[in-house]
Design a protein with these regions (language model features):
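Loop-to-transmembrane boundary segments
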Residues: 4-17, 77-97, 146-150
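Membrane-helix interface/capping segments
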Residues: 56-87, 91
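Juxtamembrane "helix-exit" motif on the non-cytosolic side of transmembrane helices
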Residues: 25-38, 101-111, 139-140
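Short, highly charged, low-complexity non-transmembrane loops/tails of multi-pass membrane proteins
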Residues: 173-196
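Hydrophobic alpha-helical transmembrane segments
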Residues: 122-161
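Transmembrane alpha-helical segments in integral membrane proteins
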Residues: 56-63, 145-177
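Transmembrane alpha-helical insertion/packing segments
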Residues: 1-66
Length: 196
């Protein structure tokens, strides 16, 4: 595990920074939509922000998988197709830490420590996951989704799933569209050239 963290700490930090940047972007768009009191626009901007975030993660995880492909083929690295999901899970560890504090606040509301730490964690989580804010303010059962502790455990799942799939595709050099991989070499440049 130590080697894994050493080899992929940069990737985890990059994914976390992508999350923070897109959270700011999404939060700003949602606030603008809420200012004009337009629920449809709020939901659409939130979905757009989430998709944009997932595309960034897809590109990053695919590149990691593609870079690992050679090491796996040469036997220098083990074939671990779930490595992308694990990298994303580690990058989302802070989100799950917030979720645990929010959960403890929900089940132990009379314990002052968990109430205060859970409140702070919820405020930070709402901001750190700003791309989901437009959806989380929708009411279900008389309360917004961000009032339910389970929401904070569900939010990181799309990122983990996308990174897992993208890493697997990168590891096997599977491309579904050229949009995501414009900077990759063409197939003709990937094969070693023979010298005559």
């Amino acid at each position: 595990m130590k080697t894994f963290l050493k080899n992929h700490s940069y990737d985890m930090v990059t994914m976390l920074l992508n999350q923070i940047a897109i959270a700011l972007f999404g939060f700003t768009l949602v606030l603008a939509a809420m200012k004009i009191n337009n629920d449809v626009l709020r939901n659409v901007t939130s979905v757009f922000s989430i998709l944009f975030y997932l595309v960034l993660l897809y590109i990053k995880a695919w590149d990691i998988g593609f870079k690992d492909k050679i090491s796996v083929e040469q036997g220098k690295k083990s074939n671990a197709p779930l490595r992308g999901a694990l990298i994303s899970l580690c990058a989302n560890a802070i989100n799950y830490l917030f979720a645990v504090f929010i959960f403890l606040r929900a089940i132990l509301p009379n314990v002052e420590f968990f109430d205060s730490v859970g409140s702070v964690a919820q405020a930070i989580a709402i901001f750190a996951q700003g791309m989901y804010t437009g959806i989380l303010v929708n009411q279900i059962g008389g309360a917004p989704l961000n009032a339910y502790w389970i929401s904070y455990f569900i939010i990181p799942l799309p990122a983990i799933l996308v990174c897992g799939v993208a890493y697997y595709f990168g590891l096997h050099d599977v491309k579904h569209t050229g949009f995501f991989h414009k900077n990759q070499y063409p197939e003709s440049d990937r094969e070693p050239k023979r010298k005559d």
